[in-house]
């Protein structure tokens, strides 16, 4: 039965049916401090990682772009800065996060290139072969069914379109893995005490084992 399927939320095993609601609840709780949380957790490196990701994009003139799990619209902003004729569909399952992204787009003057929509990456409300580029940064781990989400992204891509996914993975170097685990369990929770009313859940939502 579908309701008996299990998935991971951080290091916790939960029912697949519960994951999307858990993810939505976590990001409701951290929305106001989301950018600060990311800066603390990555030591500011997440901005460099996103920039490096987008340097891989090969786009035609006037590209149509879909960004999934957009958060506060970091990736759409970077895309529009480098491709000012781009039209970007900015999506997230969390309306609180999406509202922050919309406000940022207004304040930083890239709103005219964006359309904001509350939507799940596992059930995209777009026709086949719509986008030249689909991007997702640090969001795939929070999908309940990652294969379903990836198939949806592929469905929405035009022929010769590109999918760019930025995500954590398990370190291949055993020494680095020990350092990373120590950082995850000792440093991250303390950082999140200052940014989230529920630091444990926020930490779980950002750990690579969710992927």
Regions found by a protein language model. Name each.
Residues 162-190:
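Conserved class I S-adenosyl-L-methionine
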Residues 147-159:
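A short glycine-rich, Lys/Arg-flanked "PGG" loop and its adjoining helix->strand segment in the class I
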Residues 122-133:
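A short acidic, Gly/Pro-enriched loop at the edge of an enzyme's catalytic core
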Residues 64-123:
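Class I SAM-dependent methyltransferase SAM/SAH-binding core
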Residues 194-211:
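Single conserved hydrophobic/aromatic residue that forms the stacking wall/gate
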Residues 34, 134-135:
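Hydrophobic beta-strand segment of the Class I
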Residues 1-24:
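N-terminal auxiliary segments of SAM/dcSAM-dependent transferases
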Residues 33, 43-61, 78:
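Conserved alpha-helix/loop element of class I SAM-dependent methyltransferases that forms part
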């Amino acid at each position: 039965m579908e309701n008996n399927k299990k998935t991971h939320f951080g290091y916790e095993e939960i029912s697949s049916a519960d994951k999307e609601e858990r993810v939505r609840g976590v990001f409701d709780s951290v929305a106001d401090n989301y950018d600060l949380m990311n800066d603390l957790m990555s030591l500011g490196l997440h901005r460099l990682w996103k920039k490096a990701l987008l340097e891989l994009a090969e786009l035609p003139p006037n590209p149509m772009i879909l960004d999934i799990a957009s958060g506060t619209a970091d990736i759409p902003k970077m895309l529009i800065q480098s491709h000012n004729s781009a039209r970007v569909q900015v999506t997230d399952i969390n309306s609180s996060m999406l509202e922050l992204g919309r406000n940022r787009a207004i304040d930083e003057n890239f709103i005219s290139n964006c359309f904001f929509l509350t939507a799940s990456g596992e059930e995209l409300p777009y026709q086949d072969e719509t986008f030249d580029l689909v991007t997702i940064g640090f969001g795939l781990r929070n999908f309940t069914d990652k294969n379903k989400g990836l198939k949806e992204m592929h469905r929405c891509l035009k022929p010769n379109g590109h999918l760019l996914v930025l995500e954590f993975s398990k370190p291949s170097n055993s020494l680095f893995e020990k350092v990373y685990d120590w950082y995850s369990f000792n440093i991250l929770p303390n950082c999140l005490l200052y940014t989230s009313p529920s630091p444990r859940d926020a930490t779980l939502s950002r750990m690579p084992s969710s992927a």
